[in-house]
């Protein structure tokens, strides 16, 4: 692998990012995780009792319903006994989309979402689970923030026994109604990931440390303590043949109809670690903690593993590259790639090289396209390629030479 000195330097800087602080915080950041499941199968329920939790993780924020995203709202019934058994503080969230969430041009309608929250709260109480707070996750149009603030204030008056918090977007920070909104709520979380619409011509990352820090500094000017939401996941952005954005694929979702190109959008753990290092300084004492989106579960393909996530929370570097695998049988070379890291990785381009002979035939699996190049064969990701899941091994293709010769394989771009 090339450029080892640069890579090792980068890892060293990443590892020290949370330790070398001139003015450390008086209180450590607290960590919570969004438990964002639309349904619970037995394996998911069982996994809550059979996992090594990251050090410092104290709270689970559990989805109990969605509305305004389609024709009808949807309740989510979490496994309350299993959640209680984790020993973590439990909060509840509802996701409210803009569709059907506006009662008029200046009337955000939160009634359905708040009903879902109250139902979840009552179910939790009946199951013996104490709820620390409830959160409204609503991407309110910026022009309606003042009206949204009024709805939150009214909800608090009608439901005084709960702590009511809201999620917020960086684009709201300069809006006139933003101060009213965060003053109306009992707490607020600033989302720092997936804040830009994907663009095939001008790729934008899922998360960028420098940009996130700028938003945090803007938010601190309001003088109110808050939390920030950071990503553990990856999205696959989908585009038409003309480059029009069609949506994103997360986990098991199908590609949107008409998808001709995809763009991988992973959360970069190195950038997340660097931001954690910044937030360890007491200058950012208004940032109380991190709300991680989202808690990993067995079978996740586009999410960090529990072990990888724990590394990031501990400000340790996570490996970032997959490894090529070559199996040679005479003149036949089979190529695969292996992801031994704790994060999903974009499918790589793979080069197979040899000397003193030529390729008789070659072929790629459906996720790659084979073409001659560099004195050998290059397997490039298919335009619809996605991610290599943590722990996954995937066959790339094969090359048959006219005669047996030594063969080399490497990942391009490393």
PLM region descriptions:
Residues 233-235, 239-320:
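Substrate-binding cleft of secreted/luminal carbohydrate-active enzymes
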Residues 60, 136, 188, 228, ...:
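Conserved, mostly hydrophobic/aromatic
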Residues 24-38, 63-190:
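Chitinase-like catalytic core of GlcNAc-active glycosidases
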Residues 5-14:
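Bacterial N-terminal signal peptides
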Residues 360-401:
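Intrinsically disordered, low-complexity Pro/Gly/Ser/Thr-rich segments with frequent PxxP/GP/PP motifs
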Residues 145-146, 150-251:
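Substrate-binding surface in catalytic domains of secreted glycosidases
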Residues 17-20:
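Bacterial signal peptide processing site
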Residues 334-346, 354:
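Asparagine-centered strand-capping/turn motif at beta-strand->loop junctions
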């Amino acid at each position: 692998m090339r450029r080892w000195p640069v890579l090792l330097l980068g890892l060293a800087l990443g590892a020290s990012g949370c330790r070398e602080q001139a003015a450390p915080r008086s209180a450590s950041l607290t960590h919570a995780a969004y438990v964002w499941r639309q349904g619970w199968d037995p394996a998911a329920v069982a996994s809550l009792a059979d996992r090594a939790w990251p050090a410092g993780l104290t709270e689970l924020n559990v989805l109990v319903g969605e509305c305004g995203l389609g024709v009808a709202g949807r309740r989510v019934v979490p496994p309350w006994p299993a959640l209680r058994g984790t020993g973590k503080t439990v909060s509840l969230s509802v996701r409210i989309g803009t569709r059907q969430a506006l009662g008029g041009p200046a009337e955000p309608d939160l009634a359905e979402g708040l009903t879902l929250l109250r139902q979840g709260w009552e179910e939790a109480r009946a199951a013996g689970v104490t709820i620390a707070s409830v959160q409204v996750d609503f991407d309110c149009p910026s022009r309606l923030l003042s009206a949204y603030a009024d709805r939150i204030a009214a909800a608090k008056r009608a439901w005084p026994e709960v702590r009511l918090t809201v999620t917020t977007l960086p684009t709201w920070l300069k809006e006139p109604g933003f101060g009213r909104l965060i003053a109306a709520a009992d707490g607020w979380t600033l989302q720092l990931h997936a804040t830009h619409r994907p663009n095939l011509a001008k790729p934008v990352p899922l998360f960028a440390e420098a940009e996130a820090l700028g938003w945090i500094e803007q938010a601190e000017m309001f003088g109110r303590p808050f939390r920030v939401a950071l990503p553990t996941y990856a999205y696959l952005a989908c585009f038409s043949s003309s480059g029009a954005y069609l949506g994103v694929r997360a986990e098991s979702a199908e590609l949107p109809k008409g998808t001709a190109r995809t763009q991988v959008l992973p959360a970069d753990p190195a950038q997340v670690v660097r931001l954690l290092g910044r937030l360890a300084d007491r200058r950012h004492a208004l940032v109380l903690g991190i709300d991680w989106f989202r808690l990993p579960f067995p079978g996740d393909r586009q999410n960090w593993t529990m072990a990888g996530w724990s590394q990031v929370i501990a400000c340790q570097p996570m490996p970032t590259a997959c490894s090529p695998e070559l199996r040679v049988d005479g003149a036949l070379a089979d190529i695969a790639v292996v992801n031994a890291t704790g994060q999903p990785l974009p499918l790589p381009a793979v080069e197979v090289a040899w000397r003193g002979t030529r390729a008789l035939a070659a072929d790629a699996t459906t996720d790659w396209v084979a073409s001659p190049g560099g004195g050998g064969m290059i397997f490039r990701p298919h335009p619809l390629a996605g991610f290599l899941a943590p722990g996954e091994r995937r066959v790339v293709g094969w090359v048959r030479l006219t005669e047996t010769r030594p063969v080399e394989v490497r990942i391009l771009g490393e």
